[in-house]
Amino acid sequence: MSGNTLGTLFTVTTFGESHGPAIGCVIDGCPPGMSLAEADIQLELDRRKPGTSRHVTQRQEEDKVEILSGVFEGKTTGAPIALLIRNTDQRSKDYGNIADTFRPGHADYTYWQKFGIRDYRGGGRSSARLTAPTVAAGAVAKKWLREKFGTEIRGYMAALGEIDVPFIDWQFVRENPFFVPNADVVPQLEAYMDALRKDGDSIGARINVVASGVPVGLGEPLFDRLDADIAHAMMGINAVKGVEIGAGFASVAQRGSVHGDELTPEGFVGNHAGGVLGGISTGQDITVSIAIKPTSSIRTPRRSIDKNGQPAVVETFGRHDPCVGIRATPIAEAMLALVLIDHALRHRAQCGDVVVGTPKIAASAP
């Protein structure tokens, strides 16, 4: 299994399984001298951790992070930073009925066919539990980007199933368990999730992420374009089935006279490009939207096969998120931060001394 590392200069390698003793990651390439404590990382992990409301998995994990290396006297040393999160609430007996069968929509079948062995307990390596180390690494990236450039990365749930959530204000995002920017819609979402749980079913979601204060120039054409690497990273999140940058698929119906964001001495007029032109950041907000499929582990009986290829009926009894998207906002923020810090370091390495006479224009014209 060779696809466990993200990044070029700022790399993150995750390890562990859902029901193993621990999960974690090793960060390599973090610049030295940045103040870093476990509390800085814990703030982000607490936003993602399970068991925080009745609408998510009831697995009770504190997700307490331990910094094992790479930090001395409260500052990063430039050495690899090892982060450990111990699993404390595994309940592997819940998965005995799927040891020899495959859940429809899950990685069970493909992991078995590819590796010839699979850890069926909670999905093993394919579990969304493995997004916790990603969020931990993202906390480190967020801190560096914020201190270096003033970059702010924020996300919110834009849709839950067929319910679209109108954007009202960022302040509401941190005040509800759905990460929605609209307090008025929360009761509707709660009723929807309560009914879904009674049905033993699941649903998908749409998450929007915005990075403000990103410097112009990040991205490495042709094949390491910034938007390409963002899409690559976002598709690495469990259950993500679609990614949009800027106007995304709406660009199909837009004329060039509308989609092309005009430039004026006062700044850009519009941001249909999502802050990326030619694979390079423009200095505008980076806007990303991801589509998350319904959770595969549900109580509804479904047809499948067993390891011998014989018909089987699968019903999952473990503790699962009826909508993975409810806890996906900090995960998507972390992924965007990891891509941005990697490209910031790559830009500094090759083009840090480049100076042109053309002034950098504002992200948005007044």
Curated annotation (Swiss-Prot):
* PANTHER family (UniProt xref): CHORISMATE SYNTHASE
Supply the name of the protein. Answer: Chorismate synthase
**Which CDD domains does the record associate with it?**
Chorismate_synthase
Which HAMAP family does UniProt cross-reference here? Chorismate_synth
Q: Which reaction does it catalyse?
A: 5-O-(1-carboxyvinyl)-3-phosphoshikimate = chorismate + phosphate
* Task of the protein: This reaction introduces a second double bond into the aromatic ring system.
Indicate which residues the UniProt annotation says bind FMN. Answer: 125-127, 238-239, 278, 293-297, 319
Question: Gene of origin?
Answer: aroC
Give the EC number.
Answer: 4.2.3.5
> Which SUPFAM superfamilies does the entry link to?
Chorismate synthase, AroC
Q: Assembly and interactions?
A: Homotetramer.
Cofactor(s) needed, names only, are: FMNH2
